[in-house]
Amino acid sequence: MPPTEPILLTAAEARVLGALVEKEVTTPDYYPLSLNALVNACNQRSNREPVMDLDEDAVRQALHGLEDLHLAGRAHADGRVTKYEHLLGEAFNFSRAETALFCVLLLRGPQTPGELRGRTERMHRFDEIGEVLAGLQKLMEREPPLVAVLPRQPGTKESRYAHLLSGTVEALHAADSDSSTHREAVPIAGSDAGHEERIAQLETAFVELQQEMAALRKKIDDLFGE
């Protein structure tokens, strides 16, 4: 059942939630995520703005906050390593298009429809900008609203959209205006978005391989230690 009261996430909680949603779609073979894999997903340099440097304690604390809000939890698994999953579907019943848009807004902050179209390509393909706008409109019409359009900045042609799980429109606009003085506009092409996602997949696969090797070494040590 969708929440009836506004949700306010910390920056770390928003990053953890976005990373879990992204990895479920882009690297399903490695989802749900272990704590170590989730830390790497949060801190990866591709498809993240800003790039963060969260440690395990910060991610663990963010997970506790998301669990209290029923937005994430521990996955039921037979393995020794605890893994985590998001509960966004249970909370909001998003369509695939809405999930992709909301996820990228969580991971990269305020963006134009054109930027969102390019950056969601690996999660959901939007054939035209009109489909992006339609998805954003549905998120804006939720009660309470989950997305808002920010006032257009001076000298820009397109408005930017932001999710509302981290504050009000006024607060987000102030933060967006401040950060715009330090941000260069970089065109996002579909091929660039795909390249970023392939890098992210390799990063996740490498972490999982390290965990499997560590588990194998432990089994060998236990065997010869008996």
Locate each region found by the language model.
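N-terminal intrinsically disordered, low-complexity, charged/polar
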Residues: M1-A19, R217, D222-G225
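Positively charged, polyanion-binding regions of nucleic-acid-associated proteins
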Residues: T10-D29, N93-P110, L136, E141-R142
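Residues in the recognition helix of alpha-helical DNA-binding motifs
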Residues: A19, A62, G135, L164
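Short acidic, hydrophobic short linear motifs in intrinsically disordered regions
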Residues: T27-D53, P110-F126
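A short, conserved structural fragment
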Residues: R60-L63, E67-A77, L136-Q153
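Short, amphipathic alpha-helical interaction segments positioned at domain boundaries
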Residues: D78-T82, H86-E115, S159-G194
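Helical coiled-coil/dimerization "stalks"
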Residues: R119, P151-E158, A162-L165, Q211-E226
